[in-house]
Amino acid sequence: MTRIPSSDITDQRFYLNRRAFIASALAAAGASAFVNPELHAQQPAAHGRKLATVKSPLSGSETPNKWEHLTTYNNFYEFGTSKSDPAVNARGFKPREPWTIAIEGECARRGTITLEDVLKGQTLEDRIYRHRCVEGWSMVIPWVGFPLASLIKRCEPTSKAAFVEFTTLLDRRQMPGQESDVLQWPYVEGLRMDEAMHPLTILAVGLYGETLPNQNGAPLRLVVPWKYGFKGIKSIVKVRFLAKQPVSSWQLAWPQAYGFYANVNPAVQHPRHSQAMEARLPSLFQTMRTLPFNGYGDQVASLYAGMDLRRNY
């Protein structure tokens, strides 16, 4: 993983939707630093059950964001579109027990499996990864999880399986954001098979050595550290193996802004803003240059050899 030199960290204004407007106003008044207020608007999540883990050699060495940052500033539209909504609206979410995952499509072992069964004999790993949101902010997150490849191998995909599609739980009673029309529900995401099998790609079940809080995607979510955060689908209930590329939820909603690959790329800007810089939360003023593939290019760039990454964004 590419390290970010201190010379790449700058102290300049960073515009991030309506929250950045507040920051820029303070800067004009002479403020030298600004902490995003939504990071402190809610009580952090209660701590979960401790998990037995081992440190992965693929884990990064950067200092993770604090628990309160990670559990009060979230994109989880099933619980609302504001960053503080999930911390409030997911409090009463009760993941069904047993949590089941439907396995469908081009594989030999179709059916329904429980998360408990998936985790039997599975070594849970601590993985400190960078997290880069398409909105222009970033964090460092200490996930607990296991390689997605281990689940895929268990499903025995056929030679026709070129893609993996994931689906989030549809439960409007518990997930009030699904009453809105901001997206078509349930949320759907996908990966090319080689991306899904890559050692960096994990299914996360925890955070900071504990079970995953509701607002972070409990009980099971996808983590692909070289892609923008919207690829990290949460509360997964279905995995489907496909011969053709699936259409993800954000692709369907706004294809000019959200591509299937969603690799972090400072050279390809979002229609509303540049992707060249990012704000490392909790500060909106601690900004740094965004690295191709979020700094994981040494490990993953070969997956896209010969591809036009401006076109295949």
Residue ranges of predicted features:
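N-terminal secretory signal peptides
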Residues: 1-16, 20, 27-31, 39-42
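Structured, non-membrane catalytic/scaffold regions adjacent to prosthetic-group chemistry
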Residues: 44-313
